[in-house]
Amino acid sequence: SDVCSSDLEVIDTSNWKPFAISDLFDVVKGSRLTKADMREGTIPYIGASSFNNGITTYISNTEQLHPANTLTVCYNGSDIGRTFYQTEPYWATDDVNVLYPKFEMNEDLAMFFAPVIKCVGGLHEYGDKWKLEDMKKDVIKLPVKDDGTPDFMFMESYIQKIKKAATERISILRNI
């Protein structure tokens, strides 16, 4: 197999249907924590960053933690729309909105949703911000089953194909 070839088919999105973000997620604003109140620790502190899964430091403050298996979305600054899947409890700054899934989410589904949400967020201007109410109303298009509900199985299998292809490419590169 050639390291540059792609085993992934182009997705036909013509039959995808629109869903308001708030139909799929409860959207909650993060909380301000001043440097003076910040205590060093091991809890991820998620901010307006496009690096390191949004983690800007680690703290021990526990008053405003969000659970694992949620998404964080930067709504402010140059990284508007940047979306990350959080795998452990964390504190989200007030530059970040937290998306609590209204469905059974796993890492593969989160990896599907993150770039879809980022694309919508990228439509907002830097000075405008992606306000909480706008984020709730904004629409993402998703693959659907015959009954019109999101096709989560398709989303999971697509991400699994991407992971498999990436693993195979890494294996090829290791053997060069």
Stretch-by-stretch model annotation:
Residues 84-87, 124-128:
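Catalytic micro-motifs at enzyme active sites that drive phosphoryl/nucleotidyl and oxygen chemistry
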Residues 90-96, 127-146:
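A short glycine-rich beta-alpha junction/loop motif
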Residues 102-105, 144-148:
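A generic structural motif
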Residues 8-14, 18-22, 107, 111, ...:
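The feature marks the first
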Residues 37-38, 63, 129-132:
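A short beta-turn/loop motif at secondary-structure boundaries
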Residues 1-31, 36-52, 145-176:
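Non-catalytic DNA-recognition/assembly elements of restriction-modification systems
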Residues 40-42, 67, 134:
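Short acidic/glycine-enriched loop/turn segments that link adjacent beta-strands
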Residues 56-115:
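A short beta-sheet element
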